From Swiss-Prot:
InterPro entries: Ankyrin_rpt, Ankyrin_rpt-contain_sf, NF-kappa-B_inhibitor. It comes from Fowlpox virus (strain NVSL). ANK repeats lie at residues 2-31, 36-65, 135-164, 168-187. SUPFAM superfamilies: Ankyrin repeat. Keywords: ANK repeat, Repeat. Pfam families: Ank_2, Ank_5. GO terms for molecular function: NF-kappaB binding. The keyword Transmembrane helix does not apply. PANTHER family: NF-KAPPA-B INHIBITOR ALPHA (PTHR46680), NF-KAPPA-B INHIBITOR CACTUS (PTHR46680:SF3). The keyword Repeat applies. GO terms for biological process: cellular response to tumor necrosis factor. This is Putative ankyrin repeat protein FPV230.
Amino acid sequence: MENELKLYYAVSSQNENLVIQLLNKGYNPNAINRFKYMIPLHKAVECRNVDITKHLLSNGADANVRDFLGLGVFHILSMFSSLPELKDILHNTEGTFVLCKYNYAPLEEDYEVKTLEIARMLFISKANINMTSKLGSTPLHIASKYNNKTMVKFFLERGADINILDSNNNTPLIYAVCSVIRLYLKCY
């Protein structure tokens, strides 16, 4: 239990040197943190930490491990809107922070670049782009629901199945349409 917490918190605090040390000591990059119910790779992806994601993947992190909700790494990568929408929502003040599940991470200009770099790494590592959560949602469902155009495009270009129904009998297209309608209604 203590070992899984050490690696998780090293990733969570984005302490790259400690992550490397722990991985070199044989800490399991696939261990689920029973306290937060997250996997170190999921935390690195959520915080858009490219370097720690690389270290975890090169040390045996499985890109298809699910958390307690059945979410995979692509689900987590899809949960945030793309940078232009985040800037609009947060009014892009200097030093703006975005919620990183249990922490806040700085909203950086290279947010989308990091997102795509991590997405490519995960795809190369054979992460399943059509993995369904316990609610039947694929990463494309989530990216569509959150209006994450960057990830929607990424998934579609790589053959994501647009016909998978979630537990509400919705396809990703339904969520994309609803997302556009919500944005339209906010203007009025």
